[in-house]
Amino acid sequence: MPSLKEVKTKITGVKKTSQITKAMNMVAASRLRGAQDKMESFRPYASKFSEAMSNLSGGGNTNAFPLMDVRDVKTVELIVVTSDRGLCGSFNANVVKLTEKKMAQYRAEGKKVSLICIGKKGYQLLRKSGAVRENYSDIMAHFSINNAREIASDVADNFLKGTADKVEIIYGAFKSVAVQAPVAEDLLPIQPVVSSEPAGEQTMSGDYIYEPSSEEIMDAMQPLYLNVLVYHAMLEVGASEHAARMTAMDNATTACRDIVSNLTIVYNKARQAAVTNELMDIVGGAEALK
């Protein structure tokens, strides 16, 4: 049985750890509110933008738009979005696990795979794969639309040059405070929807009337499309990271309380044993004096 001093030292150490995890939980909860507000305010814009792009692409000649060029897929580029910091449970590991699954799948089909890593943790876990083409670390703490624009421009240039035939983005989507799920979404080529309206009609859905023409608007919107999708994924990861960290720190705090409780029982037993031994020594000494 450990000594009283050893057990007491362990209890003190675990209590200090509990204070740290509790503070980190509170910080994560505070940051989550801001990140969640930004994400939820951007979601409707991203959704409508994607819907408009799909409707526009479904109503014209897709061959006129380079970002819709569907060709034989020989090289796939995966954009992997993770956090820069850890201590958020299995959040980053789940995104990397999905990425590795996708890489194995495409390589089994004889396709080359390259990676763009956004976030330090993803890069640290994937750099040994030898597939990382570009790395954007240390931007997730204070990212902006300018970061998304830079990344989107790089991806578009790579696609237009024919270096990549297909582009997907993989990130941890925010479902709720308790649930963050890794998802993979196609970015390029832009997928058109099949329109049921007669050719030449300007209205692609009940929500839109395009003037002067859908082709001209599509040409103007294309450079913005990837910006929106990449920025949206980064916002989702920003909120998911804080939610995952809040949950992880809450679990850690609970675990610390359980450990302290168990150590306290051990301490009390050790103390009781020590007192019993002392009493036995006293009684034994008294008997010896008789």
From Swiss-Prot:
SUPFAM superfamilies: ATP synthase (F1-ATPase), gamma subunit. Keywords: ATP synthesis, Cell inner membrane, Cell membrane, CF(1), Hydrogen ion transport, Ion transport, Membrane, Transport. Gene3D superfamilies: 3.40.1380.10, ATP synthase, gamma subunit, helix hairpin domain. The keyword Magnesium does not apply. Its main location: membrane. GO terms for biological process: proton motive force-driven plasma membrane ATP synthesis. It is a peripheral membrane protein. This is ATP synthase gamma chain. It comes from Desulfotalea psychrophila (strain LSv54 / DSM 12343).
